[in-house]
Amino acid sequence: ISRGITPKYNDESGKSVVINQKCIRDNKLNLELARRQDKEIPDLKLVQKGDVLINSTGAGTLGRVTQVHEDLPDTTVDTHVTIARPLQEISSAWFGAAISHIESYIETLGEGATNQLELKREVIGRIDLVCPAIDIQNQFQTIVEPMQQQILNLMKQNTHLLKLKETLLPRLMSGELDVSKLSSIE
């Protein structure tokens, strides 16, 4: 369990990606809202596939969780996000689902004044999870992992289609693109 870095932002040409609290919502990771930075990142603070990211400051965002389902090279989190990494002997798919299931409980664990709530690493570390036998965890992973990949692929396709729509629609509306000679799409 580790907190992120204090980044030195350089959104123009930063060599690494920094995930912030805005990126974590509805159990999804939106890298469109991430920023770039130049500072060296210790290996412990590099995000890995299977990590669970937990928003750790502020009322309204504290306790939101998501799991990383793909390799994200040169990616870290800022100090407002905690990385919870499953032990080697725990299935990452099961770990992510278990943490996600108790998100509303995690939201209640913040300490401090209303606008200064903080979720400490030690508090996250004291959360007890009931662990099924490893063969059950592995069966769970075998079933769930392809679904997680499909969700990730569909989210990427949706993002691509939205960008395509935003590019094409103004050109279609202005008449810059003429589709009258195209055969109908059925």
Spans of features found by a protein language model:
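Short acidic (Asp/Glu) and glycine-rich catalytic loops that position anionic groups and cofactors
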Residues: 28-29, 74-78, 142
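Short clusters of hydrophobic/aromatic residues that line enzyme substrate/ligand-binding pockets
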Residues: 29, 37, 65-68, 106, ...
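Short, contiguous acidic/charged loop-to-helix segments that flank catalytic cores in large enzymes
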Residues: 37-40, 71, 86, 131, ...
